[in-house]
Amino acid sequence: LPEMSFEFVQSGSHLIPVDQSLVYSNQPTWNYMVAPGRAWNESGDQGFSRASFPFALIERNQNCVHNGVMTFLFNDTTISNVRYQVTQETCMYFKFDMWGQLKAAYTPSQVANAEAVTAAHFDWLKNQLPTKPISVLASDYPNAKVNETLMSSGTTPEHTTTFGVFYNGVNYISNCNTRHGKYAYCSEMRLPSYSTAKSVLAGMAYMRLGQ
Protein backbone atom coordinates (compact mmCIF):
# COMPACT_ATOMS: atom_id res chain seq x y z
CA LEU A 1 0.00 0.00 0.00
CA PRO A 2 1.11 3.60 -0.50
CA GLU A 3 1.68 5.72 2.58
CA MET A 4 -1.69 7.30 3.39
CA SER A 5 -2.74 10.29 5.45
CA PHE A 6 -6.38 10.98 6.34
CA GLU A 7 -8.20 13.76 8.14
CA PHE A 8 -11.66 12.90 9.49
CA VAL A 9 -14.56 14.73 11.08
CA GLN A 10 -16.86 12.64 13.28
CA SER A 11 -20.53 13.58 13.60
CA GLY A 12 -22.39 11.01 15.67
CA SER A 13 -21.76 7.69 13.97
CA HIS A 14 -20.66 9.33 10.72
CA LEU A 15 -16.92 9.33 9.98
CA ILE A 16 -16.38 11.91 7.25
CA PRO A 17 -13.08 12.31 5.36
CA VAL A 18 -12.20 15.95 4.77
CA ASP A 19 -10.67 15.10 1.38
CA GLN A 20 -12.56 12.56 -0.75
CA SER A 21 -10.85 13.36 -4.03
CA LEU A 22 -8.20 11.32 -5.83
CA VAL A 23 -4.93 11.48 -3.88
CA TYR A 24 -1.72 11.13 -5.87
CA SER A 25 0.74 9.12 -3.80
CA ASN A 26 4.52 8.80 -4.05
CA GLN A 27 4.13 5.07 -4.72
CA PRO A 28 4.69 4.03 -8.37
CA THR A 29 1.62 1.77 -8.70
CA TRP A 30 -1.24 3.14 -6.61
CA ASN A 31 -3.08 6.36 -5.99
CA TYR A 32 -6.02 6.23 -3.58
CA MET A 33 -9.37 7.64 -2.50
CA VAL A 34 -11.35 7.39 0.74
CA ALA A 35 -15.06 7.79 1.41
CA PRO A 36 -17.34 8.27 4.44
CA GLY A 37 -17.49 5.45 6.96
CA ARG A 38 -18.93 4.79 10.39
CA ALA A 39 -17.86 4.85 14.04
CA TRP A 40 -19.51 2.92 16.87
CA ASN A 41 -18.91 1.43 20.32
CA GLU A 42 -18.70 -2.21 21.36
CA SER A 43 -18.71 -3.43 24.96
CA GLY A 44 -15.46 -5.39 24.64
CA ASP A 45 -13.34 -2.53 23.31
CA GLN A 46 -12.34 -1.18 26.76
CA GLY A 47 -13.46 2.39 26.21
CA PHE A 48 -12.21 2.68 22.65
CA SER A 49 -14.46 3.51 19.72
CA ARG A 50 -14.41 1.36 16.62
CA ALA A 51 -14.34 2.78 13.10
CA SER A 52 -14.36 1.56 9.53
CA PHE A 53 -14.33 3.31 6.18
CA PRO A 54 -14.10 2.36 2.51
CA PHE A 55 -11.03 3.12 0.46
CA ALA A 56 -10.01 2.49 -3.11
CA LEU A 57 -6.63 1.84 -4.68
CA ILE A 58 -6.49 3.33 -8.18
CA GLU A 59 -3.84 1.97 -10.50
CA ARG A 60 -1.69 4.81 -11.73
CA ASN A 61 -2.34 5.77 -15.37
CA GLN A 62 -5.05 3.09 -15.65
CA ASN A 63 -8.77 2.68 -14.89
CA CYS A 64 -8.33 -0.31 -12.59
CA VAL A 65 -9.83 0.29 -9.13
CA HIS A 66 -9.50 -2.06 -6.15
CA ASN A 67 -12.12 -1.40 -3.46
CA GLY A 68 -11.49 -2.23 0.17
CA VAL A 69 -12.27 -1.42 3.80
CA MET A 70 -10.08 -0.27 6.69
CA THR A 71 -10.95 -0.62 10.38
CA PHE A 72 -9.34 0.42 13.67
CA LEU A 73 -9.96 1.37 17.31
CA PHE A 74 -9.40 4.87 18.66
CA ASN A 75 -9.96 7.15 21.63
CA ASP A 76 -9.17 10.80 22.34
CA THR A 77 -5.40 10.28 22.27
CA THR A 78 -4.40 7.10 20.47
CA ILE A 79 -5.22 4.60 17.74
CA SER A 80 -4.79 0.85 17.29
CA ASN A 81 -3.15 -0.83 14.34
CA VAL A 82 -5.23 -0.55 11.17
CA ARG A 83 -6.54 -3.69 9.51
CA TYR A 84 -7.47 -3.62 5.85
CA GLN A 85 -8.98 -5.93 3.25
CA VAL A 86 -9.31 -5.61 -0.53
CA THR A 87 -11.37 -8.29 -2.29
CA GLN A 88 -12.85 -6.60 -5.36
CA GLU A 89 -11.62 -4.86 -8.48
CA THR A 90 -12.93 -3.44 -11.73
CA CYS A 91 -10.45 -5.02 -14.15
CA MET A 92 -10.05 -8.56 -15.47
CA TYR A 93 -6.30 -8.34 -15.95
CA PHE A 94 -5.30 -7.55 -12.35
CA LYS A 95 -7.35 -9.60 -9.88
CA PHE A 96 -6.10 -10.34 -6.37
CA ASP A 97 -7.05 -10.32 -2.68
CA MET A 98 -5.06 -8.18 -0.26
CA TRP A 99 -5.28 -7.96 3.51
CA GLY A 100 -3.06 -7.07 6.42
CA GLN A 101 -2.39 -5.03 9.53
CA LEU A 102 -0.42 -1.77 9.58
CA LYS A 103 0.89 0.60 12.22
CA ALA A 104 -0.87 3.95 12.34
CA ALA A 105 -0.36 7.30 14.05
CA TYR A 106 -3.17 9.50 15.33
CA THR A 107 -2.95 13.25 15.92
CA PRO A 108 -6.04 14.76 17.61
CA SER A 109 -6.74 18.22 16.23
CA GLN A 110 -9.46 20.71 15.43
CA VAL A 111 -10.40 20.61 11.74
CA ALA A 112 -10.63 24.20 10.56
CA ASN A 113 -13.67 23.69 8.33
CA ALA A 114 -15.31 20.88 10.31
CA GLU A 115 -18.78 22.44 10.29
CA ALA A 116 -18.69 22.96 6.53
CA VAL A 117 -17.46 19.39 5.94
CA THR A 118 -20.24 18.01 8.14
CA ALA A 119 -22.92 20.16 6.53
CA ALA A 120 -21.79 19.17 3.04
CA HIS A 121 -21.88 15.49 3.98
CA PHE A 122 -25.44 15.56 5.32
CA ASP A 123 -26.56 17.73 2.42
CA TRP A 124 -25.11 15.11 0.06
CA LEU A 125 -26.97 12.34 1.90
CA LYS A 126 -30.23 14.29 1.75
CA ASN A 127 -29.92 14.89 -1.99
CA GLN A 128 -28.92 11.40 -3.08
CA LEU A 129 -31.02 9.68 -5.70
CA PRO A 130 -33.78 7.50 -4.22
CA THR A 131 -32.42 3.96 -4.22
CA LYS A 132 -34.15 0.59 -4.13
CA PRO A 133 -32.93 -3.00 -4.50
CA ILE A 134 -33.22 -4.12 -8.09
CA SER A 135 -35.19 -7.12 -6.82
CA VAL A 136 -38.25 -4.87 -6.28
CA LEU A 137 -38.27 -3.47 -9.83
CA ALA A 138 -40.63 -6.23 -10.98
CA SER A 139 -43.09 -5.61 -8.14
CA ASP A 140 -42.94 -1.83 -8.69
CA TYR A 141 -43.90 -2.34 -12.35
CA PRO A 142 -45.83 -5.64 -12.51
CA ASN A 143 -47.21 -4.94 -16.00
CA ALA A 144 -43.71 -4.56 -17.43
CA LYS A 145 -42.94 -8.25 -16.85
CA VAL A 146 -39.42 -7.49 -15.65
CA ASN A 147 -37.16 -10.53 -15.35
CA GLU A 148 -34.26 -9.52 -13.13
CA THR A 149 -32.26 -12.65 -13.92
CA LEU A 150 -31.99 -11.64 -17.59
CA MET A 151 -30.31 -8.34 -16.73
CA SER A 152 -27.03 -10.02 -15.87
CA SER A 153 -27.45 -13.15 -17.97
CA GLY A 154 -24.75 -12.07 -20.42
CA THR A 155 -22.10 -11.69 -17.74
CA THR A 156 -20.03 -14.08 -15.63
CA PRO A 157 -21.19 -13.86 -11.98
CA GLU A 158 -17.71 -14.01 -10.46
CA HIS A 159 -16.64 -11.11 -12.67
CA THR A 160 -19.74 -8.98 -12.02
CA THR A 161 -19.55 -6.45 -9.21
CA THR A 162 -22.90 -4.68 -9.52
CA PHE A 163 -25.54 -3.64 -12.03
CA GLY A 164 -28.62 -1.47 -11.98
CA VAL A 165 -31.37 0.44 -13.74
CA PHE A 166 -32.32 4.09 -13.34
CA TYR A 167 -36.03 4.55 -14.04
CA ASN A 168 -38.63 7.17 -13.09
CA GLY A 169 -36.24 8.93 -10.73
CA VAL A 170 -35.25 5.80 -8.80
CA ASN A 171 -31.88 4.05 -8.92
CA TYR A 172 -32.53 0.29 -8.76
CA ILE A 173 -29.27 -1.45 -7.89
CA SER A 174 -28.02 -4.95 -7.17
CA ASN A 175 -25.74 -5.84 -4.28
CA CYS A 176 -22.10 -4.84 -4.59
CA ASN A 177 -20.39 -8.22 -4.58
CA THR A 178 -16.84 -9.19 -3.66
CA ARG A 179 -15.13 -12.57 -3.56
CA HIS A 180 -15.86 -12.75 0.17
CA GLY A 181 -19.38 -11.42 0.55
CA LYS A 182 -21.26 -8.19 0.02
CA TYR A 183 -19.35 -4.91 0.10
CA ALA A 184 -20.32 -3.05 3.26
CA TYR A 185 -20.30 0.40 1.61
CA CYS A 186 -22.06 -0.25 -1.68
CA SER A 187 -23.00 3.38 -2.30
CA GLU A 188 -19.36 4.38 -1.79
CA MET A 189 -17.83 1.82 -4.15
CA ARG A 190 -15.65 3.55 -6.74
CA LEU A 191 -16.47 2.37 -10.27
CA PRO A 192 -14.49 3.74 -13.25
CA SER A 193 -16.41 4.74 -16.33
CA TYR A 194 -14.07 3.29 -18.97
CA SER A 195 -15.60 3.91 -22.43
CA THR A 196 -18.59 5.74 -20.97
CA ALA A 197 -16.42 8.79 -20.39
CA LYS A 198 -15.17 8.74 -23.98
CA SER A 199 -18.73 8.47 -25.32
CA VAL A 200 -20.09 11.25 -23.10
CA LEU A 201 -17.14 13.52 -23.86
CA ALA A 202 -17.83 13.47 -27.59
CA GLY A 203 -21.53 14.21 -27.10
CA MET A 204 -20.81 17.05 -24.69
CA ALA A 205 -18.24 18.52 -27.09
CA TYR A 206 -20.81 18.57 -29.92
CA MET A 207 -23.36 20.11 -27.57
CA ARG A 208 -20.95 22.89 -26.64
CA LEU A 209 -20.13 23.50 -30.29
CA GLY A 210 -23.84 23.76 -31.03
CA GLN A 211 -24.22 26.44 -28.39
Feature names for model-found ranges:
Residues 157, 188, 192-197:
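Extracytoplasmic/periplasmic, Sec-exported soluble proteins
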Residues 83, 175-177, 205-207:
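Short, solvent-exposed loop/turn and secondary-structure capping segments
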